[in-house]
Amino acid sequence: FKVGLVFQYPEYQLFEETVYKDIAFGPTNMKLSEEEIDSRVREAAGFTGIDEELFERSPLELSGGQKRRIAIAGVIAMRPEVLVLDEPTAGLDPAGCRQIQENLCAYREKTGATVIIVSHSMDDVARLAERILVFDKGHVVMDGTPEEVFSRPEELTGIGLDVPHATELAMALR
């Protein structure tokens, strides 16, 4: 499986009657064996911090953070080579954000998958990214390491992006 996409709003990709079935949807459609499907569901749940006690509950009755983790698990269960996430931490509390970020880093490290995160949170980007592409009106306007991109705070703010708090502090101390 090549590319997996996780939408910004998990409600748009959750539709099965149970958490287990939702995570299993992709692998089931890949025509995998029941044993392989079960293995992938449990592995993806582990990567995303979903307790197996939730497997028989409806995903639609869970919290926003739980829904987001289930949506991510459903895509991870297909083992994509490239995982694309649109605003994966939007609307989450700081603890939820950290957990999602840690889970994504663990997934990338264990599988070697490319993880692409679309985000307006420059603090998240600074913590997670090895390479940053900044787009403005559909065009790439910056491409580099976090250090290279965040060394240009005026350009970032000029296109409506904030700079990470650490960058703001460093600029204030100069």
Question: Model features per residue range: what roles?
Answer:
Residues R79:
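Conserved catalytic motifs of ABC-family nucleotide-binding domains
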Residues S58-L62, Q66:
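Conserved ABC ATPase signature
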Residues L83-D86:
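Catalytic Walker B motif of ABC-type/P-loop ATPase nucleotide-binding domains
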Residues S119-H120:
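H-loop/switch region of ABC-family ATPase nucleotide-binding domains
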Residues E35-E53:
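Conserved ABC ATPase "signature" region
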